[in-house]
Amino acid sequence: MQPQPHISPNTATAAISAALESQRSRKNRGSYNCGRCGQPKKGHVCLLTAPPDIPTTPIASEPVSCISAAASSSRSTVLSLTAAPSSRQTFTHLRRALSFDDVDARNSLDESDLDAASMDLDLQLDTDIVQPGRFHAVGLWEVLKRLPPSSLLMAARVCKGWRETSRKMWKAAEELRIRVPERAQIGYIGSLLQKCPRLIRLSLKIESDFDATTLACIAFSCPNLEVLEITTSGAAVNRISGDELSRFVANKRGLTSLKMEGCSNLGGFSLSSSSLSTLWLSDLHSLSKMIFNCPNLTEISLEFSRQEDDSTDLVTMVDGLGRTCTRLQNIHIASLKLSHTVVLSLTAVNFRYLRMLSLVLGINITDASVAAISSGYKNLELLDLSGSSITDTGLGMICDVLPDTLSKLLVALCPNITSSGIQFATAQLPLLELMDCGMTVSDPNSDNPTFVENPSPHKTPGYNQKMFIKHKRLKKLSLWGCSSLDALFLNCPELMDLNLNLCSNLHPESLVLQCPKLQLVYASGCQGLLTGAIRKQVSENFSAGENHMPRKRLADASKRIQALPSLYQETREDGIYAGKRRKLEKEMCTIIH
């Protein structure tokens, strides 16, 4: 597939505005020239047929969809409309509740697939009526599909051809992402949704208060909806109750994914759906009941408010999940009420397919809880116990049970873990690719670690800790807030992302980075000289990885081969080519400070 040129929404909007002004100043009488050969229409009979690559009745592959930021191309234009894959290529890149990898899905649809699928939907676009600008319908479609909805509405006012094209584009849309401004009325959402009868995926970012009227509008306008995501911004309040949410889920029998923020007013709910597979609810507080009758649910993420007066019974909730949602693979629970009792209830249920477990902010989760998890779930790929009270002993239990499966371990905000435990975990987990140890090796007397320009050489011995990590597969390492760390040695050939934010006691002369693939380093709040030391070592790693052996062409000048220094004297021409090649192959590392 040839890369499509990026057309900025601002540029396209400006062009549309200019076209509108020209339309007001003169009357559009249509085109006087033939749309195929360019000759005057008067007395003209065109003998040319439409070229095969620009059909007279173009285009749109299967329904046009709005690609989300996680699955878009290098353009990150919000709410842009792009062509959807054909039915032979289905892309379901739903971000997992417990996935900490950046999703970089690309649309791999090539032009042949696009042409083959273009006949499935007859848009009846006539190239002769596309005015002004005299675009072919194919070119107009390529321009309009890059516009956000607001600009697409403006484009419909240019002329009849543009209005018909934009109308058919709305009609074919499968996915839509909308930012609802603070002053917008409920009719704003309804007017947009009524234009998209084929809509399957909907994402709303709401900046004002909303209630069940929004759900009713969505249910009425989107009969085929499968994925719904509602996020809040600013001071927006979600006033949807638990009964209203339960009614919506029960009526939308095709709904497979529901993600909603600001669920502080639910009070309690009973969700019943045979199709729902992904459920994210955040800002939950004091729920009187939580009933899940969703046999196909595979992923659940429940985040509770960080208030001490939360009265939600997590033990009863976990028991209910075990009875009705036996297919769960990913579980994420963030609550201050997490305790060892909840963990025991979770292990007693024994989810057979569980692969990712995240229990965050559970200060009452101890090494005994780790022992229960290790005995009940021996195939975990991700384990997140951030904010717990586990120690190095708990890390040892994890390493003993999960060395063959665990690839992601997150133990941030665990003050009882030391650098020795972290080193032991990296040595005993050969498949580890991501590790988050933020705020573990930190100074307990400093709640707010700050930058220290001239640290004192005389520190309390217990607070100065050193860390030596050697790992063949580790790709991401986070040591943010480890203010007691004064020496760091990393030998990780696959490491690409390193977070050293607020490592204020880390000395430049005590930092060794043997990471040739390092691409991104965070060093905010560190010593001033540390950034220079990082940049120097990364540069040296790249230089060490380059091949400085001279090369020589064969007798027929067809191929370059390595030659021994004693047998070959490098010429100026070879040096120029080698320098260009090294310049192209060299990768840059970004340091954020």
From Swiss-Prot:
Domain called F-box: residue spans: 120-177
Extent of the LRR repeats: 178-206, 207-232, 237-262, 276-304, 335-361, 362-387, 414-439, 477-502, 503-525
Any one GO cellular component localisation term in the record: male germ cell nucleus
Disruption phenotype: Stabilization of KRP6 and inhibition of germ cell cycle progression leading to male sterility.
Tissue specificity of this protein: Expressed in developing pollen.
Primary site of residence: nucleus
Places the protein is found: Nucleus
Record note on domains: The F-box is necessary for the interaction with ASK proteins.
Quaternary organization: Part of a SCF (ASK-cullin-F-box) protein ligase complex. Interacts with SKP1A/ASK1, KRP4, KRP6 and KRP7.
Known role: Essential protein for male fertility. Component of the SCF(ASK-cullin-F-box) E3 ubiquitin ligase complex SCF(FBL17), which mediates the ubiquitination and subsequent proteasomal degradation of target proteins. Enables the switch in cell cycle control leading to male germ cell lineage formation from microspores after meiosis. Targets CDKA-1 inhibitors the degradation specifically in male germ cells (e.g. KRP6 and KRP7) and thus enables CDKA-1 activation and germ cell S-phase progression. Promotes twin sperm cell production and double fertilization.
UniProt-recorded name of the protein: F-box/LRR-repeat protein 17
Organism: Arabidopsis thaliana
Lineage, top ranks: Eukaryota, Viridiplantae, Streptophyta, Embryophyta, Tracheophyta
Gene designation: FBL17
